[in-house]
Amino acid sequence: MEKKCRRCAWVNPEDPIYIKYHDEEWGVPLHDDHALYELFLLETFQAGLSWATILHKRENFRRAYEGFHPERVAAFDAAKIDALMQDAGIVRNRRKIETSITNSRVFLDIVHEYGSFDAYIWGFTEGKSIRESWELRITSPLSDRITKDLKRRGMKFVGSTSIYSTLQAIGVLAAHAEDCDWRQP
C-alpha cells in the first residue's frame, strides 16, 4: 500500500498542476535569475486572480512572453502589447501587460546594480532561508521592506502580499505547513 503524501492545506488535491508546483517548486530555494524573473512576472498577473489560474496559463505565458527573457520583454512595444491583448491563453489585462514591461526594465536595472537578481533578493536575508511558523499571514516586515524598495525603484503592481507569496515560493521564507511532508527540519 502506497503512503498518502501530506501537503500544505492550500494545495488542491484534485489539481495535478498545483500538486506538481507544490511538490517540485514551491518553497525550494531558487537562485536562478531566469526562474526568479518568471515568478516575479507571473506574480504581476496573479493580482486579483488565483495562483491556480496563473499556473494553468503558465505555458501560454512562456510562449507569449518569449521564454521569459527580461531583455526581450523590456523591449516590447505597442504592437506587441496589442498582440498580447488578443492572446486568449494569457491574462489579457492591458495595465498588467504594460506593468510587466516596466517591471522587466526595473528587474534589469537591479541585475545591473547587484550583478544578479538573486544577489538582490537573497541579500535581504544574507542568503539564508527564514523559517516561518505556519500560520495564516499574508505579509511580514521582510515583505514590507522589499516591497518598499521595489516600488522606490519603479516596480508596479507589487504589494507586500504578492512579495510575501513570492518569498515563500522561492524559498526565502520556508513556510511549508508543520504537517507537510515537504517541510524541511
Where do the protein language model's features map onto the residues?
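HhH-family (HhH-GPD) DNA N-glycosylase catalytic core used in base-excision repair
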Residues: 1-185
